[in-house]
A protein has these predicted regions:
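Mid-domain catalytic core of redox enzymes
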Residues: 210-328, 462-463, 467, 478, ...
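Rossmann-like flavin
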Residues: 53-162
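A glycine-rich dinucleotide-binding beta-alpha-beta segment and adjacent secondary-structure elements
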Residues: 142-156, 312-316, 368-428
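N-terminal glycine-rich phosphate/pyrophosphate-binding loop and immediately adjacent elements
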Residues: 1-96, 398
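Helical element adjacent to the flavin cofactor pocket in flavoenzyme catalytic cores
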Residues: 168-223
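A conserved FAD-binding loop/helix module that cradles the flavin
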Residues: 15, 424-447
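FAD-dependent oxidoreductase catalytic-site/capping-region signature
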Residues: 314-399
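General small-molecule cofactor/ligand-binding pocket signal
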Residues: 40-42, 202-206, 374
């Protein structure tokens, strides 16, 4: 979570909404607190407003009956029936995979098989080799609906034509509810940091770590850039696991995570973060969450697979100041995310191309910004790599593409005793609630291992603070987007 400054105030340039709220209710409860005493959450009645060239538009709310009526008006009664079938399947997937995947410290194949056997309605989405886009083409006739629901693959950094059909469950995860955070998503990070300090955690923000010290076959300390050494019995690394494999925190850590846990890489992004006056016919209808679809998905994801910038990408626009409902007066804060290939170096023509392919298209669709953002408002894949060395600019960690991708993602325990993983690059994956769950899994692993070694008797049922515990990381003003 991060912000960048603007004349209208700090712009959230990372995640834009909160989903799976129960994860955070549970997290605050673990510390004996209530989330609502620390943050004001703004429920979004419309999950997203979807736009296509030619003027067609579809709002989705998460209410199956209401959404089916909207789909009927948008694409006809047959597609409304198809939507109901898809929604039922996605609901079944979400319920079946929650306990054996999301809530488990690692995906358990036996438990997954058992859960799936009891839900034959979800079997069509589990066929090996069937992509999410392929599955949706069997569900819907209207290509716009295929395009809309296939896009959920990008929420975890995958291409719809290569990501597995099981990712249809992301629709139901979002449909369970979307909240904006008053003041911006970074307020969640601030609230958690404040709570951690109250519990005795020593936060050292913007403190670079030079290496994780390995001695006698286990982690013994973390060495900071200024030479300070922090002895530890356990170290939780919340960066991209690819940094370990690249040796950025010490040669002795290269084999802590298998190569299959960090490659292939997920998508990156070009991200605009700025303040401006929105004008044009579409301006009154912009909401917090907006998606402007490309005319041809193949023209978007084909170039991405080749490491190129699409000529007509889909554009995600977060109008941050519209989360509470009324249209603000004066400049507003906006974040626009354009999918990008990982590992792409900055090229001289990239700014002009990305600017034209973003703002010329929006002008054609009836939306303009005054002033239009300059180069300093754009975060590129190469910038993300510099911010997160070893990541190749991927903002979702390992790619979710492939039938068994979820089993390849690294879990909390690494091959090096004393070293643990948390964050979007670890199980269960990318996204704010998933990263939070990864922290829960890492904490449980640390406590279990320390207890087994006779170093602690701490229980996970009540808040505890470990003397000398240290968290290092970046300030929230860094530039690193994630949806």
């Amino acid at each position: 979570m991060r912000t960048v400054p603007s004349p209208a105030g700090p712009v959230d340039a990372g995640p834009t909404v909160l989903t799976l709220r129960q994860v955070f209710d549970d997290l605050f409860s673990l510390a004996g607190e209530r989330l609502e005493d620390h943050l004001t959450l703004l429920p979004q009645a419309t999950l997203a407003r979807h736009w296509w060239e030619g003027g067609s538009r579809l709002d989705l709310t998460g209410d199956t009956d209401r959404d089916a009526r909207a789909v009927a008006a948008f694409a006809g009664p047959q597609e409304a029936s198809a939507f109901r079938r898809f929604d039922y399947l996605a609901r079944g997937l979400h319920r079946a995979f929650d306990a054996p995947v999301m809530q488990a410290p690692g995906p358990r194949l036996g438990a997954i098989v058992t859960a799936a056997l009891g839900r034959p309605a979800i079997w069509p989405a589990l066929l090996p080799g069937l992509s999410l886009a392929g599955h949706l083409r069997r569900q819907f006739r209207d290509p716009r609906l295929v395009q809309l629901f296939a896009r959920y693959a990008t929420y975890v950094g995958g291409r719809p034509t290569h990501a597995p059909g099981v990712l249809a469950l992301i629709w139901r995860a979002e449909a369970e509810g979307v909240w904006a955070v008053q003041g911006g998503m970074h307020r969640l990070a601030v609230a958690l940091a404040d709570l951690a300090e109250r519990l005795g955690v020593d936060l050292r923000l913007a403190t670079p770590a030079r290496r994780i010290v390995r001695q006698a076959g286990r982690v013994t300390a973390v060495q900071l850039q200024d030479g300070t050494t922090l002895p530890c019995a356990a170290c939780v690394f919340a960066g991209d696991p690819a940094a370990l494999a690249a040796g950025h925190l010490g040669e002795g850590l290269r084999t802590a995570v298998p190569a299959s846990g960090t490659t292939p890489r997920s998508l990156s992004a070009w991200v605009w973060s700025f303040a401006a006056m929105a004008k044009g016919p579409l301006t009154p209808d912009l909401i917090h969450h907006n998606v402007f679809f490309s005319a041809d998905p193949k023209a978007e994801f084909g170039p991405l697979g080749k490491g190129e910038m699409p000529e007509q990408p889909t554009l995600y626009i977060c109008a941050e100041d519209r989360a509470a409902g009324p249209v603000p007066v004066g400049p507003e804060r906006f974040e626009i995310i354009v999918n990008a290939p990982p590992g792409r170096p900055d090229q001289p023509e990239d700014f002009a191309r990305c600017h034209a392919r973003t703002f010329q298209r929006l002008r054609q669709m009836g939306l303009t910004f005054t002033p239009e953002p300059e180069a300093e408002a754009l975060t590129t894949p190469a910038m993300l790599e510099r911010l997160f060395p070893g990541s190749a600019g991927s903002i979702y960690g390992r790619s979710p593409e492939g039938t068994f991708a979820t089993f390849a993602r690294p879990q909390a325990r690494t091959a090096l005793p004393g070293l643990y993983l948390a964050g979007g690059g670890a199980h269960p994956g990318a996204g704010v609630p998933m990263a939070a769950l990864s922290g829960k899994h890492a904490a449980a692993a640390v406590l279990a291992d320390l207890k087994a070694a006779g170093l602690t008797s701490a229980s996970t049922s009540r808040p505890t603070a470990m003397p000398g515990g240290t968290l290092t990381g970046s300030a929230t003003t860094g530039r690193a987007p994630s949806r």
